[in-house]
């Protein structure tokens, strides 16, 4: 009897801890995302993945999406087809995050390069300045300011709820 009650209690405590941990992660992500809104894009100077150009934050003033990705990121592969679709309507700049150049280039050659260019952030310096916790993360940037941010995969639902209304508002102004 005592052993059965003890097992039940342990299971209840474990499940409660999992639920609490999950809710804290979700809340922290939402708070962090909201805090990042309307902040300037950090100052940076990075080479493009093809090493042909040096890009600074001053070069990026129009409306664009900044997508943090890596060849080792499974979720990046999942969201890639959707990003290809939206790249037909809005420019997407890639931020290749803590990746080997050859792996990243091979990944784009295999899946298709939807980016107007990819910044090569081997050490994750710009990603750190952006508050990135991992790939993928996606930012909507307008006039040098971050106006929307999402941690994780961007799909139709996320795109519609977090990004599209802001893009439409800008296009209608």
Give the location of each predicted region:
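Thiol/disulfide oxidoreductase modules built on the thioredoxin-like
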Residues: 110-114, 122-170
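Short glycine/proline-enriched coil/turn segments at helix->beta-strand junctions
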Residues: 42, 60-64, 87-92, 113-116, ...
